[in-house]
């Protein structure tokens, strides 16, 4: 089974944070609310079709979570499994890992052609959280993938605002500015566009549509319950 299919093939695997939380429930006993949460977990991690949870179900989840969609595959749910400083590792039920930093996908583990490395993240315009500065910025980076274009391909990115949208997340509206990132990979000069929905109040990325490299599928990710340290 290829990695793209594995993203939505919900089997018996649970991320470590979920296993730890479930173990705590076994030690402390289950109330009505925790029983409801366990039922939600069973629904999420064994459902084979597109995942769509109600606002109530999402509120019952005790950890950061996000919807993710890879190419034309059905929507899946990922939960926050690891935190390493500003780097957040989101895991699907069968172990595919999507790693973000400041709302950008910077690495994957378990896809057919993983993004292994993305350089110069300290200069990433998404770190700035200043919408008035983004359109005038250019970001130069270097990327490596596991199967093709494996070593140090230069990328350049330009930015512009393309609109505004109010996102409804767990019944709460977030006013966002949509930023288009136009990426060019050298030396092939292959181009593609990424999109980031940035919260006008907090500066957080609430949603992304990001292509991780030439000829790779677009990954759409909507942050439902963001991580807070």
Regions found by a protein language model. Give the residues of each.
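C-terminal partner/receptor-binding element of secreted or periplasmic proteins
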Residues: 129-135
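Acidic, serine/threonine-rich low-complexity disordered tracts
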Residues: 31-111, 116-117, 135-229
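Bacterial N-terminal signal peptides that target proteins for export
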Residues: 2-20
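C-terminal motif of bacterial Sec signal peptides marking the signal peptidase cleavage site
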Residues: 26-29
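Surface-exposed beta-loop interaction hotspot
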Residues: 125-126
């Amino acid at each position: 089974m290829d990695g793209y299919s594995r993203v939505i093939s919900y089997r018996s695997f649970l991320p470590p944070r979920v296993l730890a939380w479930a173990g705590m429930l076994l030690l402390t006993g289950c109330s009505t609310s925790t029983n409801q949460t366990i039922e939600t977990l069973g629904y999420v991690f064994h459902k084979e079709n597109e995942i769509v949870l109600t606002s109530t179900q999402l509120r019952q989840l005790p950890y950061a979570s996000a919807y993710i969609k890879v190419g034309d595959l059905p929507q899946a749910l990922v939960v926050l499994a690891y935190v390493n400083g500003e780097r957040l590792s989101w895991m699907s039920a069968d172990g595919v890992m999507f790693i973000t930093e400041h709302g950008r996908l910077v690495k994957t583990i378990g896809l057919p052609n993983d993004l292994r490395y993305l350089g110069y993240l300290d200069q990433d315009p998404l770190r700035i959280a200043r919408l008035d500065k983004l359109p005038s910025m250019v970001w130069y980076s270097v990327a490596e993938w596991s199967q093709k274009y494996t070593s140090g391909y230069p990328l350049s990115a330009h930015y512009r605002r393309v609109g505004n949208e109010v996102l409804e997340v767990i019944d709460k509206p977030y006013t966002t500015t949509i930023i288009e990132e136009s990426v060019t990979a050298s030396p092939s000069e292959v181009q593609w566009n990424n999109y980031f929905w940035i919260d006008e109040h907090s500066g957080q990325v609430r949603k992304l549509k990001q292509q991780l490299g030439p000829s790779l599928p677009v990954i759409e990710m909507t942050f439902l319950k963001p991580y807070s340290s």
